[in-house]
Regions:
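Class I S-adenosyl-L-methionine-dependent methyltransferase catalytic core
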Residues: 1-149
């Protein structure tokens, strides 16, 4: 087990490639707005240095976002909700936390929610898998149509 990956201080839970590949086959992603040079899932991506929260996500196609899982996650969910008005699908992979304000403000009743069965085995920056995550996950899909306020 990779103890650093499962630490509560860790905010980087890298998407398992096979999990991404299944979603990518469905949506054909063009942008990963919350990546690093090593973890980017799309040829177009933003890093912490280029700050995906301050950039437009309108790059002509679907967006895949597995944001940092820290206190800022609500800002990423709000950004996805707002960017979905651009007409392209936006797909988030986030912890399944229905008790949060961002869930009620920007997800519930406004997006498709797919709860992930079991616990994902996230990876580190080098693709090394850990034990199953200590939290459940969900895929949140803004379908590119006008989202409900």
């Amino acid at each position: 087990m990779n103890a650093a990956l499962l630490s509560s201080k860790n905010m980087c839970w890298c998407t398992p490639q096979d999990f991404f590949d299944k979603l990518n086959a469905e949506f054909g992603f063009v942008l990963d707005p919350a990546a690093t040079d090593k973890t980017a899932k799309c040829s177009l991506y933003y890093t912490p240095e280029t700050d995906g929260l301050s950039q437009s996500w309108d790059r002509g196609g679907a967006v895949f976002c597995n944001p940092p899982y820290g206190r800022e996650i609500g800002k990423w969910v709000q950004k996805a909700f707002e960017e979905a008005r651009g007409g392209y699908p936006i797909v988030l992979l986030i912890p399944a936390r229905s008790d949060t304000a961002y869930f009620h403000d920007y997800i519930y009743g406004k997006a498709e929610i797919r709860f992930v069965r079991g616990r994902l085995r996230f990876t580190d920056d080098d693709g090394n898998a850990a034990d199953p995550a200590p939290f459940p996950s969900m895929v949140v899909i803004y379908n590119g149509e006008r989202v409900k306020e």
